[in-house]
Amino acid sequence: MSQTLQALADGLPADAFAVLGPKLLADGRRQVRVLAPGAEAMGLIDPRGKLLARMQASAIDGVFEGTLAVDGPYRLRIVWPDRVQEVEDPYAFAATLDESLLLQIAAGDGQALRRALGAQHLHCGDVPGVRFALWAPHAQRVAVVGDFNGWDVRRHPMRQRIGGFWELFLPRVDAGARYKYAVTAADGRVLLKADPVARQTELPPATASVVPSAATFAWTDAAWMANRDPAAVPGPLSIYEVHAASWRRDGHNQPLDWPTLAEQLIPYVQQLGFTHIELLPITEHPFGGSWGYQPLGLYAPTARHGSPDGFAQFVDACHRAGIGVILDWVSAHFPDDAHGLAQFDGAALYEHADPREGMHRDWNTLIYNYGRPEVTAYLLGSALEWIEHYHLDGLRVDAVASMLYRDYGRAEGEWVPNAHGGRENLEAVAFLRQLNRDIATQFPGVLTIAEESTAWPGVTAAISDGGLGFTHKWNMGWMHDTLGYMQRDPAERAHHHSQLTFGLVYAFDERFVLPLSHDEVVHGTGGLLGQMPGDDWRRFANLRAYLALMWAHPGDKLLFMGAEFGQWADWNHDQSLDWHLLDGARHRGMQQLVGDLNAALRRTPALYRGTHRAEGFDWSVADDARNSVLAFVRHDPDGGAPLLAVSNLTPQPHHDYHVGVPRAGLWREILNTDSAHYGGSNLGNSGRLATEPVGMHGHAQRLRLTLPPLATIYLQAEK
């Protein structure tokens, strides 16, 4: 026993519960031992504060011993040099983690992990406290350290459970207390690690975890949540992609907190008519320059914007305003910061040991080991935490292509084939299917959007049909082709017309989102406006035409912040958008156009009901490369009015341009990007146009149109 006590006093591996706390003596009394290095004196008291026994310092430094003659609960009265502390003895409590939960985690159950691990408020009997729990199977010893014990690694060694799990209930730990785990590796190194399942963190660059509030947030979005019905007719989906730390900043160039973002961002998004906000990763991340894409706290909103409750308030306010919230979520890799997941218990745990499997050379990050059920439980639990705890409406899963292929970014000989000799990461495939299965089963109606840049088949196909089960996939091919086309001088566009039309070859193979994202406005490219050719007038006209073409094209929409008013410069994550540009009429016109595009999308079923179905689209003009004109019809599968979109992507206007349409009668121009309202030359088709009974472009009727320069127009059939 003395050896065990000495080991504990030295901070070495030993079974604390074997020697600390109350032990029954042969005569019926209880002997109590407490490890409290630095304490000057100690006593045992009853719950009302009455002294039951004085404790004596033993020969082992920091160990106190005392005997209780009576049965019943006791507390410790510890005299420290600067204060007196009265608290229950953590080593008087039995284990609180249900073994069945631990077995479920070991089988890959994310919900079980959410319930078991991290800093969880609970009562043992009538004693409030926090249970700390983690997974560290290679560790010899784990202790919890924090504000409540002076960060002394000797004070609170944890109880080891089956499967490499550790737990300790600490009475009366307050919300807001900072903590970490002191993990003793097999080789004796002591590693100070943040809690992988922390629900709150310190503000970076500080790295401690924080005990969250015990209070339950009072949501007011019941109506929104009840209406999130996957069986309902699909509505429009138009996403405003936001980096919360740089959308707008305060007077000291600091990120806005969640209440301020709610006050400013939500009305702005409402005004522009977007249906959803997609947040670049707000999971806690040590390096702001990663934009959140190198996270370590997959269960905690970053402290850069305030508390977790502040984020819940933001989501609640979005829902009250009729706006959904999507989180950019990173399950592909993690950074190797010393306080994080890398070598968490002194060995490769969350990552692969072999760098050919475990390291992303492109990003100098580590790859999750999707073959370990506890690791997939950790990732699944994170996804479910954001959806259930924060009422999120979707996850955009980052870098899916890097997960699917073992040779992603690797030369021959730098990767390990799968069990069948192939390049596919079969464990990652299984994980992604489980992710989508869990979300669809437990939270029907929640979106899962894959950023997948290859031609992997069936990303949005049903799992039962061999697919991955995502609800949507980013259409990176469409973005690269069309943006590349628009960056060309109009004089060259005739030779590259297929860049506009090729996307329709595969437009209905997946449920696509058309993304003009943050990736298109960084690394010296300038903003979308700055990437357009020509003088200022032509740049604005090109971008207006491009955005209207995008909004009419099959697929849901995503636009990164700043593009809606024509930011010239690269996006800078360390400063606000250039809001002063809205002093200029053309920038205001661009912003008004985006609002009008979203309004047209919302009120025109032909633009969204058939957006993922081939019967929702017909070409009228696909091959007029010489004039850089294309025209197509969008159909409402439920029989609503069709819409004709026509783009003229040269500065040359066309008069009396004939386009075939599917319905006889009157057609009305409902949007024209060359309108003077948007800063254009105001050429167009005022009023209503009557069809002529002349067959053209596979349709029985035709229209005679005026096509303004560098513009897109929408015309809708009238009843």
Curated annotation (Swiss-Prot):
Transmembrane segments: none annotated. The keyword Glycosyltransferase applies. One of its GO terms (molecular function) is cation binding. The active site is at D398 (nucleophile), E451 (proton donor). It comes from the Bacteria. SMART domains: Aamy. Pathway: Glycan biosynthesis; glycogen biosynthesis. Its EC number is 2.4.1.18. Signal peptide: none annotated. It catalyses: Transfers a segment of a (1->4)-alpha-D-glucan chain to a primary hydroxy group in a similar glucan chain. Monomer. This is 1,4-alpha-glucan branching enzyme GlgB 2. It comes from Xanthomonas axonopodis pv. citri (strain 306). The gene is glgB2.
